[in-house]
Amino acid sequence: LGVYFNIESDIGDFDVRYIGTFLDKFEQEASGDFSALQAKKDAGEIPDSIPLKGFGDLLGKDGVYDNKHTLRVSWDKGPYRVSLFGLKKGSFEQTSLGLKDGKPYIVPSMTTLNLTMSYDFELNDHDARIRFAVKNLKDERAPTADRYYGYYADAHQDYGKNYYLDFTIKM
């Protein structure tokens, strides 16, 4: 789903963009060697204690979230521009873990915000721009999961709040 809205005014131009992705199905069939292994497991030749993963109904499991949202709100007037960008990724179950009461371990959703400010100008007859940005404005950390880095790197990033300053000149 995409929603786009633009308005021009005396105090500047405003732009709002929202994109939402919603999955209701995410399935993968076993093929090749996995198909043969699944047949052996179905026949009882491979014990139930040995899981075969990566196919079947994968929605909401192991990094496959069922929704993702992006929102960008920007304003510009003359040489000035400010933009706020948000990204939210939905929650999912980590199937290799469970809670003591038998409930599945849910890796919660994660939302990050980025703020960018820029100014365009001329420098010695060349177009130039200076930009300052704060990525992960609220210092959101990736949700804890039982993975190599303590979070699900296939679905999340754990960079923490960071800043950059960019200077561009067109020669």
Q: Where are the regions a protein language model picked out?
A:
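Short, well-ordered amphipathic alpha-helices
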Residues: L1-N6, N114-D120, F167
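Surface-exposed coil/turn segments at beta-strand junctions on protein surfaces, enriched
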Residues: S9, V64, W75, I106-P108, ...
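Residues that define the transmembrane beta-barrel architecture of outer-membrane proteins
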Residues: L1, Y65-H69, S109-L113, H126, ...
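Gram-negative outer-membrane beta-barrel transporters
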Residues: L1-S96
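C-terminal beta-signal and adjacent terminal beta-strands/loops
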Residues: D24-E27, F85-L97, Y119-M171
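Extracellular loop and loop/strand-boundary signature of outer-membrane beta-barrel proteins
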Residues: G54-L59, L99-Y105, G150-A155
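Outer membrane beta-barrel transmembrane domains
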Residues: D101-D120, A128-R131
